[in-house]
């Protein structure tokens, strides 16, 4: 949002963006790239951080913008950045399985969850991932990745030994609706930064669904390490 001109625009690619003439203060929604999920009974990828920054000062109406890319296989997402007069303003890329990020990645079976809000912002840019298996002998499913609006869901289901396909992947955390801030008229308004669903192992399991706002569903592993 360009104050004074009351113009709302959306930028989905990196580059130097030319705003309305005379623009010196903007309100911006900054959404980073989401992470990839893990393999096997892996945790879901965390959503990229989502921040609504109410007042960014600019030195001119030409603004360098970096739109963070999504993570490659098992990888973290990349930061999104707006370079203001006082320096870069950013949101943090999502955390892959067990990793911290804008929103944290879900846990793989017994590993720790990835923590969200890696940039230590207030209000927070995201949430933690969900938990995985219960004990080392129960390799059931991964937790869901955190979303901008909610933590990732924990894995669950009947308890069983490895290879029995007893687990249910955690759902991805829900995203956040930016429409109240930027209005419904913008083509890119809506819910963003949902977390990825946790994966599950074996044909009788259920993978986690993705969080609202772009989170991808987890997969069911029917082989070894896929």
What does each model-found stretch correspond to?
Residues 1-4, 8-16, 25-226:
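Low-complexity, glycine/proline-biased repetitive segments and flexible coils/loops
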């Amino acid at each position: 949002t360009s104050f004074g001109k009351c113009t709302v625009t959306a930028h989905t690619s990196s580059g130097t963006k030319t705003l309305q003439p005379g623009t010196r203060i903007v309100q911006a929604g900054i959404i980073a790239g989401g992470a990839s999920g893990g393999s096997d009974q892996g945790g879901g990828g965390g959503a990229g951080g989502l921040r609504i920054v109410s007042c960014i000062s600019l030195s001119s109406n030409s603004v360098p913008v970096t739109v963070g890319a999504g993570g490659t296989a098992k990888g973290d997402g990349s930061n999104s950045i707006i370079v203001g007069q006082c320096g870069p303003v950013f949101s943090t890329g999502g955390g892959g399985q067990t990793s911290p990020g804008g929103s944290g990645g879900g846990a793989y079976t017994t590993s720790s969850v990835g923590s969200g809000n890696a940039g230590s912002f207030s209000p927070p840019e995201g949430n933690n991932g969900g938990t995985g298996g219960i004990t080392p002998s129960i390799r059931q499913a991964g937790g869901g990745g955190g979303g901008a609006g909610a933590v990732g869901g924990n894995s669950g289901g009947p308890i069983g030994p490895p290879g029995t396909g007893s687990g249910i992947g955690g759902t991805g955390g829900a995203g956040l609706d930016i429409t109240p801030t930027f209005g419904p008229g913008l083509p890119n308004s809506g819910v963003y930064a949902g977390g990825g669903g946790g994966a599950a192992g074996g044909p009788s399991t259920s993978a986690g669904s993705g969080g609202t706002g772009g989170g991808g569903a987890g997969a069911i592993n029917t082989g070894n390490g896929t």
